[in-house]
Swiss-Prot record:
This is Large ribosomal subunit protein uL16. It comes from the Bacteria. Belongs to the universal ribosomal protein uL16 family. Coiled coil: none annotated. It holds the Pfam family Ribosomal_L16. GO terms for molecular function: rRNA binding; structural constituent of ribosome; tRNA binding. It comes from Spiroplasma kunkelii. Signal peptide: none annotated. GO terms for cellular component: cytosolic large ribosomal subunit. Keywords: Ribonucleoprotein, Ribosomal protein, RNA-binding, rRNA-binding, tRNA-binding.
Length: 137
């Protein structure tokens, strides 16, 4: 699972995912990429599930780049606790994904294999996505 080694603060402010991404919008490393069409928080478990789906379909051939990282801790208060008395404890780690962010990239496999692997990864994520080719963003 992806999570930061250490953070300056345990409980950060919430980062909004509305609007378009400023960076990380082009396929830089691989030949094909998975680009988000919506904004959302993507948990480290969802990122890992998408990675496993891709690598298993590609049978460990080729290379997969994960272009997002879960930096933000999402907090939650325990059940049946009254309002107030501070912020809840960190529950999970999420990556903030805005519209147009390239989340995954693939290289080193045939085009059909890459497209199917990215399609499988798409179904593991809570955002609408599209598959883009390098240079055709």
């Amino acid at each position: 699972m992806l999570l930061p080694k250490r953070t300056k603060y345990r409980r950060p402010h919430r980062i909004k995912y509305e609007g378009k991404a400023k960076g990380n919008t082009k396929v830089d490393f691989g030949e094909f990429g998975l680009k988000s069409l919506d904004g959302a928080w993507i948990t480290n478990r969802q990122i890992e599930a998408a990675r496993i789906a891709m690598t298993r379909y590609m049978k460990r051939w080729g290379k997969v780049w994960i272009r997002i990282f879960p930096h933000m801790a999402k907090t939650k208060k325990p059940l049946e606790v009254r309002m107030g008395s501070g912020k809840g404890s960190p529950e999970e780690w999420v990556a903030v994904v805005k519209t147009g962010t390239v989340m995954f990239e693939v290289a080193g496999v045939s085009e059909e294999t890459a497209l199917e692997a990215l399609r499988l990864a798409m179904h593991k994520l809570p955002v609408r996505c599209k598959i883009v080719k390098k240079g055709e963003e």
